[in-house]
Amino acid sequence: MCGIVGLFLKDASLEPKLGELLSAMMITMSDRGPDSAGIALYGNKQPNLLKLTLQSPTPDQDFDGLDHLVSERTGSEVTMERRDTHGVLFVTSELLLEVRRALGDLRPSIRLMSTGESIEIYKEVGHPAGVVNRFQLEKMAGTHGIGHTRMATESIVNTLGAHPFSTGIDQCLVHNGSLSN
């Protein structure tokens, strides 16, 4: 059993409240999936930049100074915003492959959750209300988002098993049930 929520805002005046609206939806859906949760938010585009949303099992160790290390490695300015176990690196599209290689060399335990101009994927193990609070979802803005509450039935409960899954640049997937059926 899992729960899926989604919201596409047609009224731009509501964009600052997207996180607040999705938070309430995720918490309401908690009984459908209490072991892990995730959210994909679309918004906060930066001109000429891509966002790489990263996850780390040891964020204090992995994220401390990461933007400076990647900047030194690439010779270009890279900035980062951190949210609990996740961080968003802002890079130019020309640097994407170089930055991904640098991340593998510098911090091999970091996992790439999503890449795109608009998407940010946040997901973790725990009750959906706790996941929403950890990432301060209620403070996030955007144009649309999709969330998933999970109760694992055929696989282990871990961060990588939580949804959404990145399927390409600015794309993600959530599903309810076994894809093998």
Which residues fall in each region the model found?
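N-terminal segments that mediate ammonia production and transfer
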Residues: 1-181
